Design a protein with these regions (language model features):
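Positively charged, solvent-exposed patches that mediate nucleic-acid binding
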Residues: 1-135
């Protein structure tokens, strides 16, 4: 779309431990998951005041247990770029809502296949996640 800004400001980055830890707690009922190919999304909604920012979506990226910092950072960059270009799928859904969607994107594939499977699987996963929050 012509008028959209495809930015990824710091306020949308999921950095606080108290927001990240509940996403990985298996005993919680309010955490959902979407898995498509090599990408898994963990998500939950929280009150906007709890995040510290007035942003509709906060997202973090975990490349998994990839050996070597260069390859791990490359996978993280691919995940961030894939989300940045398609972020409006989620942001538009949560713009008018009083809560914030917190998402952790996990890469669960082979590092050699990252450059092909992330652009293929991440958009599908984001679409499935957005479909869960249809009005």
């Amino acid at each position: 779309m012509a008028g959209r800004a495809y930015r990824f400001p710091r306020a949308t980055r999921l950095k606080r431990r108290r927001l990240i830890r509940p996403l990985f707690d298996r005993d919680r009922d309010d955490v959902g998951t979407v898995a498509v190919g090599c990408v898994r999304l963990l998500f939950r909604t929280v009150a906007r005041e709890e995040t510290g920012y007035d942003t509709p979506v906060q997202i973090g990226f975990a490349p998994g247990r990839i050996r070597g910092a260069v390859v791990r950072n490359r996978v993280r960059r691919l995940l961030r770029e894939g989300y940045r270009v398609r972020q409006h799928v989620l942001v538009d859904r949560f713009q008018q809502r009083p809560d914030t969607l917190t998402v952790m994107v996990l890469f669960r594939g082979r590092e050699e296949a990252a450059s092909t499977c992330i652009p293929r699987d991440l958009p599908k996963a984001l679409e499935r996640l957005a479909a869960r929050f249809m009005p």
